[in-house]
Amino acid sequence: MSEMDAVNKIRELRDAFGSFMTGVTVVTTCKDDGTPLGFTANSFASVSLDPALLLVSIAKTSSNYHNFADASHFAINILAEEQKDVSNIFARPSDDRFAQLVWAKSEYQNPLIDGVSAWFDCTTYQVVDAGDHAILIGKVENFTSAGFAGLGYYRGAYFTPAKSSTDVISSMKVMMMALIGHENKILLEQTADHKWALPHLMVEKDGAEKALEKIFATYQPEASPSFIYSVYDDVTTQQQYIAFLCNTPVPTAHKGQFVDLNDLEKLTFTDSALQSMLMRYRKENYLKTYGVYYGNHTSGTVRQIVKEGV
């Protein structure tokens, strides 16, 4: 293989790796003198639940390589969908990146960035040599998940899962529903005929994203969308239903009430499709494995898309 062929092969391999959609993280630590350091990475993965381990890789050509490979601690900050600017700060050269951020030092002396979807405060468990990179394996000492939708990365460009998902919604009559979860509870409201429903709103000309914003403003302003959970048609009403899986860090609501998932059998719902969807959600929430339902009011298929790690 010629040198040019080898270069082209590496480029093709990089492009192939780029076909895998990932989130965006900022990996942080502090030098012995307290100076904060960080770099962006999408090569993040959970490794183990017991003990709680995760990994991220760093290129040996990185100016931060020795600082992180020799560090006894580091943190993973998973960026939220509104934090493209934070990712760009760490992607560009700067004398003091952290001066542009709101952050705090953790118990283990790692910078934790404000407003992230989640953070993991780690001690270094192992550093593994891996070709032109090193794999940093961290032992999770503490973590927080805010429930915000994460910032995505695909083929060299950012995307936001919730906003991208709204693009698939057609111009037909659409009912938007928000499946807003908090821990082992789901937000429901009781209708005038004493049946239960999800927070919902008909999509108008201003689009699905605005409909979601209105639902959140009415029911739970701290909620944020993750991805489409169910898409189905009802031929009797000639209407399409879109349900977004959402999360909130707040256990109370402006309207409706949070109901324990174990109490679903005690309730009467507005229709059988909603009841079936909530029963599926209860099972998937327990397993921490989520899928998307495509079909009609009575039958369809579920495709797994998310399996939570650490």
UniProtKB/Swiss-Prot annotation:
Q: Does the keyword Flavoprotein apply?
A: yes
Q: What InterPro entries does the annotation carry? A: Flavin_Rdtase-like_dom, NADH-dep_flavin_reductase, Split_barrel_FMN-bd
Disulfide pairs here are: none
Which molecular function terms from Gene Ontology are attached? flavin reductase (NADH) activity; FMN binding; FMN reductase (NADH) activity; riboflavin reductase (NADPH) activity
Tell me the keywords, alphabetical order: Allosteric enzyme, FAD, Flavoprotein, FMN, NAD, Oxidoreductase
Gene3D superfamilies according to UniProt? Electron Transport, Fmn-binding Protein, Chain A (2.30.110.10), Nucleoside Triphosphate Pyrophosphohydrolase (3.90.79.10)
Spell out the activity regulation: Maximal reductase activity is achieved only upon trigonelline (TG) binding to the reductase component before interaction with NADH. It seems that TgnA undergoes an allosteric transition upon trigonelline (TG) binding accounting for the positive cooperativity toward NADH oxidation.
Which amino acids does the record list as binding FMN? 40-43, 57-63, 90-91, 97
Q: Which SMART domains match?
A: Flavin_Reduct (SM00903)
Q: Which SUPFAM superfamilies match?
A: FMN-binding split barrel (SSF50475)
Enzyme Commission number: 1.5.1.36
What broad class of enzyme is this? oxidoreductase
Question: What catalytic activity is recorded?
Answer: a reduced flavin + NAD(+) = an oxidized flavin + NADH + 2 H(+); FADH2 + NAD(+) = FAD + NADH + 2 H(+); FMNH2 + NAD(+) = FMN + NADH + 2 H(+)
Q: Which Pfam families match?
A: Flavin_Reduct
Q: Does the keyword Oxidoreductase apply?
A: yes
Which family does the UniProt entry place this protein in?
Answer: Belongs to the non-flavoprotein flavin reductase family.
Job of this protein: Involved in the degradation of the pyridine ring of trigonelline (TG; N-methylnicotinate) into succinate and methylamine as carbon and nitrogen sources, respectively. TgnA catalyzes the reduction of flavin (FMN or FAD) by NADH and supplies the reduced flavin to the oxygenase component TgnB.
- Give the multimer and partner information: Homodimer. The trigonelline monooxygenase is composed of a reductase component TgnA and an oxygenase component TgnB.
Protein name per its UniProtKB record = Flavin-dependent trigonelline monooxygenase, reductase component
Organism the protein comes from: Acinetobacter baylyi (strain ATCC 33305 / BD413 / ADP1)
The gene behind this protein is: tgnA
